[in-house]
Amino acid sequence: MNAAVILIIGIVILALGYVFYGGWLSKQWGIDPSRTTPAHELEDGMDYCPAKAPVLMGHHFSSIAGAGPINGPIQAAVFGWVPVLLWVLIGGIFFVGVHDYGALFASVRNNGQSIGTVVESSIGQKAKRLFIIFSYLTLILVVAAFASIVANTFKATYLESGAVDVAKSAANATTAIISLLFIVLAIFFGFFVYRRNAPLGVSTLIGVVAIAMIMWLGIKWHPIYLSYQTWMIICGIYILVASVTPVWILLQPRDYLSSFLLYAMMLLALIGVVGAHPSLDMPAFTGFVDTVAPTGSSLGYMFPALFVTIACGAISGFHSLVGSGTTAKQLNNEKDAQPIAYGGMLIECVLALVSLCAVAYIWERYKTGEVVTPTVVFATGLSEMLGKVFGAGAVNVTYTLMVLAVSVFCLTSLDTATRLARYMFQEFWLKPGEKVSDPTVTGARKVLCNPYVSTAITVVLGIALGMTGYAKIWPLFGAANQLLAGLGLLAVAAWLGKMGRNNKMFIFPMIFMILVTLTSLVFTIKAQIVGIIAGGQGVAWFYIRGILAVLLVILAIDLVIEGGKAIASNSKKAEQA
């Protein structure tokens, strides 16, 4: 099968899904362009700030994309290209499109508050607190992981003498200096667009040219060689400042400009796949159990592994936090919700399909373990395709661009996750209907709701975990993230039912994702029990992971029972009305 044909057919199906299913959802939910959004009604110049649709699309897309739609499809390719293709297309249109769009819509109709507040209004305060605790701890893990990824991407390599190995450190130093200069560029862009009213089109053109100049400068001049620990501290300081800075200064302009790197990467990828039109030299289906195991560790059974491994690109709970966190507070008009939330997610699905084509192109090297790191697989496959289109000289240049783009998005996801965690932490202490600025928020609650205090607590926890043992509990993240997706679907379904609107499009995806995550957690608990019985060094981590997995199962069951009652009650009221 030709990879270009698969990619083109996939794009057409996703586009049809956006037009017909996305349009149907807008009608079912009652999207109202004349309704004032929280970005205008509650504008404070800090978190609530209306953004033009292209700018907000840049923020939303940069925040949800990251490395997820690259890593997941490549790792899940061990089951064959057909299961990956089907899950990306079906999951994109009927699962994550509904999930992301619904979370944003529900948040906008609840004053831009997070999905936790939606849980409170539709299920109850106890459910809200449980949901926020779970979401906050998941975000702390995300902060730890992405800070560590960024620090590893930037760090220098040292010789035994203690001196910097410049040859081995040059690529990381290049990425570091480009990323830092990118932040400076974003601040200037935000200042001129928002404070000097510079035309967005002209500013964008200048910004894109400046990005190219920064990349050239970074390749030629990279004087920063710092250790992993130093970069972790710098990341901590950066997200501490970035997460309490008004969104127009850094978050909006940086994510908007960052999105052009991703667009450029995707455009080159499409040119590479269509231009080289390679055959898919990998099995269509390998079986219901991972027997390829290129990393030496099998993913296990296709159910639930496929649906947990491919998160971004099919459905990811993190997206509901972004949509109901930062994006909802910047939405200029309700009519922008479909292209940003539903459309942005389907673009991410295209990136997932491109990732599948990349791993298929170098399948023999991947399955033998010669090239296994997803980012390297992605960059290698696509750069070699582009080499066939533009000549051998394009391979190294495009490889560097691919790796750099992924690194930039890890940084954008990092400070977005920190800001989201701050929102969650603040909302946890609020009573029903309260806002952080209300005079009723006093004493310890006022201190804990202070943005600087809540951000500092989040950053300290995240960076400390990143510098110690986050990798030991990271295996739980996949199931936790997909459980968050299932609970997000549950929350919006309950809220729509309470509002008297059609919520049936949420029921099957919700049930399916909760079954997937519970099955995955049961397998995880079983593996930890086996590890505990075997004993040996590191047995304490088997206990920790096992306990956390059991707690996640209990949390899921509790919230499902509470949410199920709310949905059933609302359905009964609707029938009686």
Give the residues covered by each predicted segment.
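Extracellular loop-to-transmembrane helix junctions
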Residues: 2-19, 76-107, 116, 174-182, ...
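Juxtamembrane transmembrane-helix boundary signature
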Residues: 15-38, 60, 90-116, 194, ...
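Membrane-interface "cap" regions at the ends of multi-pass membrane proteins
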Residues: 16-70, 259, 301, 305, ...
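Membrane-interface helix-loop-helix modules in multi-pass membrane proteins
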Residues: 49-110, 121-125, 138, 142-158, ...
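Membrane-helix boundary/coupling elements in multi-pass transport proteins
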Residues: 67-74, 91-99, 103, 107-111, ...
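Loop-to-transmembrane helix boundary motifs in multi-pass membrane proteins
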Residues: 125-140, 343-350, 393-398, 427-467
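Hydrophobic alpha-helical segments and their helix-loop junctions in multi-pass secondary transporters
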Residues: 194-195, 209-233, 241-243, 263-291, ...
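Extracellular/periplasmic helix-exit of transmembrane alpha-helices
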Residues: 273-291, 346-381, 416
